[in-house]
Amino acid sequence: MAVDPVQERSASSVQSLLRALDLLEALGRLGDSRLGELADEVGLHPSTAHRLLGTLCARGFVTQDGRSGRYRLGYAVLALAQDTGKHTGELRVIARPHLDAIRDACGETVNLVVLERGRAVCIEQAEGTRRVRMNMELGRGFSAHSVASGKAFLAYAKEWRAVLGRDEPYDRLTPRTKVTGEELEAEFAAIRASGVSVEQEENEVGVTCVAAPVFSTSMTPVAAISVCAPTTRLLEMQSGLTRLLRGHAVELSRQLGHSLLTSPEDNGARTLKSDFDRASESSRGAGS
């Protein structure tokens, strides 16, 4: 069978793009580097690395010292990073009142999470008022397949396997972690149907999390709002909490320009109050 020249050129272009991205990531890890060091780091022939670096230099993503010949990241990368930081900063500011309102209703720590390279990363947090509370470390990444916030992203991804960047079975972090595509596909369908993601002790034994996706102008989530708590405590207030998260996620999405979501009739605040009061009474003796 003859090879389609258009498809062949397309495959070659994708390969070149991936190699160029590998070089950028290598420069980010290594800092100023010689051609040979970079080629070895990413497994390329020096001539191929030199050609790709030349293109990146021409676009300002990489610069080369004229005397030493060493390469470093260019100002175009910094400009992109500043744009990303600006977007993230705006998102945090707009989301903050919602995080505070949810925290005030349930007493638990509330997280604003984004997806970075297949990992759920907390970028903002309203710390809970409970003596025993579950906090996501700011800036730390968690495997998206094992946490509620990560699943809230994956459920809407066209190619969620590519987002994870790994082959199944995925890492089993606890006995309850879902590690096969079949298990995750079923869960993602349920998340899309309900608008919320519930993860029970899949990332850490004894901890359960609930999350709701936040959208901007498309059906691809730009963030997720999540609450994590000791399993017994969270399950006792799950009904009201999921509805409360969903209501705030819908409102935040509208503020970010989304218009396709509908808000539930009851945002969950009343249900959550009775659930939370019951959970507080049952856990008071345990010193929670």
Language-model-detected regions and their locations in the chain:
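Short, solvent-exposed cationic patches
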Residues: 144-150, 239-259
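N-terminal helix-turn-helix
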Residues: 2-89, 250-258, 278-281, 288
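Short, structured helix-loop boundary elements
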Residues: 13-17, 70, 74, 88, ...
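Short, highly charged C-terminal tails/helix-capping segments
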Residues: 258-285
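Short, solvent-exposed recognition segments
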Residues: 2-3, 131-205, 271
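Amphipathic alpha-helical effector-binding/dimerization core
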Residues: 67, 72-168
